[in-house]
């Protein structure tokens, strides 16, 4: 059974401005593992990576129904890729989490569907 659905879209140029020499932004948004991946990226690929993670975390918080804040922080949520490159959202939840991230020239978008773990 579907418990929640969340979607978020972010302008890449907004993230690009936040990344401009501001390691603090990445420390606030990305987990240590995500920052390790980000440090290997440059230019537009870095912007897309961070924007995708930002959108995924926002979409998850909307699917849960709390938004980012006291109950769920950016650092409570980690996005990894499986062996085929599919993004996987990792968090301490009892739900099955389905995540999709996409990018265009100007935007990154993510959608999260939460499903109850008992089928």
UniProtKB/Swiss-Prot annotation:
Subcellular location: Cytoplasm
Gene Ontology annotations of biological process type: fatty acid biosynthetic process; lysine biosynthetic process via aminoadipic acid
Enzyme Commission number(s) from the entry: 2.7.8.7
Entry cofactors: Mg(2+)
Molecular-function annotations in GO: holo-[acyl-carrier-protein] synthase activity; magnesium ion binding
Keywords: Cytoplasm, Fatty acid biosynthesis, Fatty acid metabolism, Lipid biosynthesis, Lipid metabolism, Magnesium, Metal-binding, Transferase
Binding residues for Mg(2+): 8, 58
SUPFAM superfamilies linked: 4'-phosphopantetheinyl transferase
InterPro entries in UniProt: 4-PPantetheinyl_Trfase_dom (IPR008278), 4-PPantetheinyl_Trfase_dom_sf (IPR037143), ACPS (IPR002582), P-Pant_transferase_sf (IPR050559), Ppantetheine-prot_Trfase_dom (IPR004568)
Catalyzed reaction equations: apo-[ACP] + CoA = holo-[ACP] + adenosine 3',5'-bisphosphate + H(+)
Assigned GO CC terms: cytosol
Function: Transfers the 4'-phosphopantetheine moiety from coenzyme A to a Ser of acyl-carrier-protein.
Family membership noted in the UniProt record: Belongs to the P-Pant transferase superfamily. AcpS family.
HAMAP family tied to this protein: AcpS
UniProt name for this protein: Holo-[acyl-carrier-protein] synthase
């Amino acid at each position: 059974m579907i418990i929640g659905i969340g979607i978020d879209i972010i302008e890449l140029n907004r993230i690009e401005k936040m990344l401009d020499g501001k390691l603090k932004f990445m420390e606030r948004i990305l987990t240590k593992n995500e920052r390790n991946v980000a440090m290997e990226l440059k230019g537009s690929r870095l912007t897309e990576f961070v924007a995708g993670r930002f959108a995924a975390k926002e979409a998850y918080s909307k699917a849960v129904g709390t938004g980012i804040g006291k109950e769920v922080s950016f650092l409570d949520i980690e996005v990894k890729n499986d062996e085929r490159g599919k993004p996987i959202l990792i968090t301490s939840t009892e739900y099955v989490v389905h995540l999709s991230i996409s990018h265009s020239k100007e935007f990154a978008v993510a959608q999260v569907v939460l499903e109850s773990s008992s089928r």
